[in-house]
Every structure is written in C-alpha cells, then in structure tokens.
Amino acid sequence: MEATISADIIRSTSLPKEGMIVLQERLRDFMDFLNKTFDGCWGRVVRGDGIECAISDAHYLLRIVLLLKCQIKAIRVCFDEMNIKGGDKRFFKFGVRMAVAIGRLRTNDKEQAIMDGEAIYNSGRALDQMGSYDFFSISSDYKESEPIVQSLFLLINHIMKRVSARQSQVLFMKLQNMSDVEIAQRMGITRVGVYLHLKSIGWDAISTALRCYEMMKF
C-alpha cells in the first residue's frame, strides 16, 4: 500500500522576502532529504508553497509527516539567527496544513516526476476542502485499520502543535535514529539538554505511536 501527502504552508504570504527565500530553501532541502532517505519516495514543491509527496510504502508515512512538520517549524530558528522579522503567529505555531491518504498510486515515477492515482486525488481533494482553521486530514483505503490510523495521526498532530522550533530540530534528528550524543554534538548542547527536550516534547508517546503504526499490516 502506498500513500501521499498534499500540503501547503500556513500564512506564507505574511513572510518578508528574506523569509520566503529561507522557506523555499528549506522545502527544497526536505525534498532532497526525502529522495535520499526513503526508498521510492519523492516530493515536489507546487504553486510556490504547496507540497506533494509520493510515499512508496505507507509504513513510512507517519515518520515522514513528523519530519516535514519539524522541518517547517524549525524555520523560526533560522529567522532568529538571521534577524528576519515578520510572519503570522499561525505560521510559527502550525507551520503546514496537511492532508494525507493511504491508498494506491497508478503511477509513481520519480524520474518523470509523475504521481497519479486515487491516493493523490484523495489527499489533494481533502486539502482543497479544508477550512481556514483546519490543519490536518487523513483518509485510508484500508478500512479495517482506519480508526487506529486516524487516532495515531491525530495524536501526533496534537503533540506537534506545542513543539518549539528548537525542539523541532532535536526531534528531526531523533526521527532519523540519531543517538542523544550525536544530537547533542550537532546542536551544541549537552546530552542532558537533549534528554530534557525529548521529554518535554513527549518522545515516549511519539516513539510508541511510530512503532505501533509501522507494525501495522497494509
């Protein structure tokens, strides 16, 4: 079973020119990361601040959703370091509106940049139908497990609402299975600092949700 992500950046038009440049760079970086890290997965930026991702194995989906949210929320750190002002508070709190779908892709061709099929139609349609204060939607063709999948994704979405930009950086690395020592070295903080960030985020709940989801049968 495959999956797709359709997303757009919340209130990106509130960003100054310098902020938009940073945002575009971070989106391109994420697409490169996705292509290199997850076999058969790829993504593209559409309509300036829109995102479409084709996921070759639905088991990757929850981890990729978390990584994408972290990538966007961590932008605040770059803004502070570069002294970039402006931006709507909803951009910094939520970062990205996202609709995901678990289903079939008739065509998933990274080389030709073609994704086509029911899954991308479903996620794209769901994103277009979202209201101003809706930030997440999920649909699944695997009806037997849909209630469990919905619960796991909604739990993760709720947790991510209160994760700070700096915590998002830590979580992004932890989701790549880096050790606390390695994260501490990259962040320039102590191992205890990493531990406290992860505890505040709710890493135990996130890692349990990931294990549960990645063991599901699709």
Q: Where do the language-model regions lie?
A:
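Regulatory and interdomain segments flanking nucleotide-handling catalytic cores
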Residues: 1-218
